[in-house]
Amino acid sequence: MTDHALLLVNLGSPASTSVADVRRYLNQFLMDPYVVDLPWPVRRLLVSLILIKRPEQSAHAYASIWWEEGSPLVVLTRRLQAAMVEHWPHGPVEIAMRYGQPALPDVLERLAAQGVRKVTLAPLYPQFADSTVTTVVDLAKQTVSERQLPLQMRVLQPFYEHPAYIEALAASARPHLETGYDHLLLSFHGLPERHLKKLFPKGVKHDLRAADCCHGATAEVRSVCYRGQCLATAKAFAQKMGIPDGKWSVSFQSRLGRDKWIEPYTETRLDELAKAGVKKLLVMCPAFVADCIETLEEIGMRGSEQFVEAGGRELVLVPCLNDHPEWVRVLADMCEKA
């Protein structure tokens, strides 16, 4: 075994469905300044208020999708890790979570102790956002610096419209699309508009409510516009699959709080599509590479119930890439070239 490790990093999960474990996880997640980007005193107060009721609600949601082996997100990421081993001959393949266990700093320290000297860090997020990619990369760099770990790092960059990634999405989703459907909704995780606006170059006007917000935008703007990258993923996928305009659309889910988030909202689109006569709705969640509470519970359970209550007949959740063989091959190749 050589000294070059591959480290796959995902968001994370509570250790269990207990209210105490969920509260601990939510506190770590929401206190990240890249997630709730407010001054510390305001963030602490807001998170403390959220933690009064949210842990019990979230614990119930986690319990509804929890597997015998544990958290679906962690289990599926470990399956991906196991599949990647034969595609990475340079050293160990490990996983880490930004929040919860296995903790990213601890995994980096363990790799260094094992004699690893180079790490390819792979944040498992196709699109760029401070609250996903930046927080992972910054924590990794901070850990290496503060703990004086003898590690050289290179980072897998966002791959939202990489042709091979789009091909992997197509290979994974094709069997589900071939069963027939009335409409395909590509539901991405949402973000507050201010998370995007603060990254745009000063003086740049960028309409985050436009149908194609990055049309004509500079490369600098496109590199930090999460909404535009999501739209690019969706458009590339629809073109790859030959899905005509009008039979697919994009929305953004998981809104939290009262701030303005990027639109259109998934909960709104579910009602609109049902009322427009869509009976069989397929939903994909391409911001996630592994199924998790946002896909299995928010869309697969609550979203399905909402769609049927609004007049639809059936909502079919298309699984994420998880450990699909084509995704494993594509991810290994992208990491090799990172």
Curated annotation (Swiss-Prot):
Subcellular location: Cytoplasm
An example Gene Ontology CC term for this record: cytoplasm
Pfam families xrefs: Ferrochelatase
Main location as per UniProt: cytoplasm
Binding annotation for Fe cation: H189, E294
Pathway(s) it belongs to: Porphyrin-containing compound metabolism; protoheme biosynthesis; protoheme from protoporphyrin-IX: step 1/1
GO molecular function: ferrochelatase activity; metal ion binding
GO biological process: heme biosynthetic process
Gene3D superfamilies linked to this entry: 3.40.50.1400
Highest taxon of source: Bacteria
Keyword Calcium: no
Keyword Cytoplasm among UniProt keywords: yes
Family statement: Belongs to the ferrochelatase family.
Name the record gives this protein: Ferrochelatase
Organism, as annotated: Pseudomonas putida (strain ATCC 700007 / DSM 6899 / JCM 31910 / BCRC 17059 / LMG 24140 / F1)
